[in-house]
Amino acid sequence: RIFFAFIWIIGRVLLWIYRVDVKGLENLPKHSVLLCPNHSTDLDPVLIGLCLPLDYHLHFMAKAELFDNRALAWLIRTLGAFPVQRDGKDIQSIKTAMQVLHKGENLLIFPEGTTIRGGVGYHDGLPAHAHAGIAMIGVRTGATLVPVFCDGQKKPFHKTRIIFGEPYVPEVTGRRGTSEELQAIADEMLRQAYA
């Protein structure tokens, strides 16, 4: 935790360099929160994490390839990351995500599943698509979902906005909801992130 605190302090200086304008932190509950940001660059989870209080206990999924480098794997694990295979069949990462939320800690998952290209809200020129898995994790754990907007201007001295939206606890049919309900929840989180 000492190393993490050191990184966090250095990171807060970087927020000033990147001119990050943060709004909506008052919207965040303290426990079992599932942050649902749009995904514009690889720096998004780091910038969002640095906006939060030091004791917020944020975890996030990171593509498994990043863990191939031992030094990088150690660093991102220290920052709260755990690996996910992005073929959509990684049961272990889903279990880990649910364990994080059941423990009362907080989790960041990108509804789009990957960084976007082609403009805000678009991926390769097509409208961004939300994956229903984020809603499934939220519903099964009873987590509070919070949409987050990152504007993607990650150049030094160019203003960047990070906006935390209103918290949302989804209501579904039964304990798990239908596939249509879960997709609608995921779509709504992404829509609110871009609103």
Describe the residue ranges of each PLM region.
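A transmembrane-helix-recognition feature enriched in membrane-embedded lipid enzymes
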Residues: 1-27, 43, 54, 70-79
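Short, basic, glycine/proline-bearing loop/turn elements
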Residues: 10, 78-85, 117-122
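Glycine-rich, highly charged phosphate/nucleotide-binding loops
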Residues: 17-21, 88-93
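A structural micro-motif
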Residues: 20, 56-58, 79, 105, ...
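Hydrophobic residues in beta-strands and at strand termini
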Residues: 22-24, 84, 164
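Flexible, charged surface loops at secondary-structure boundaries
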Residues: 27-31, 101-102
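Catalytic core of membrane glycerolipid acyltransferases/transacylases, capturing the structured
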Residues: 29-88
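Non-catalytic C-terminal accessory region of glycerolipid acyltransferases
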Residues: 93-195
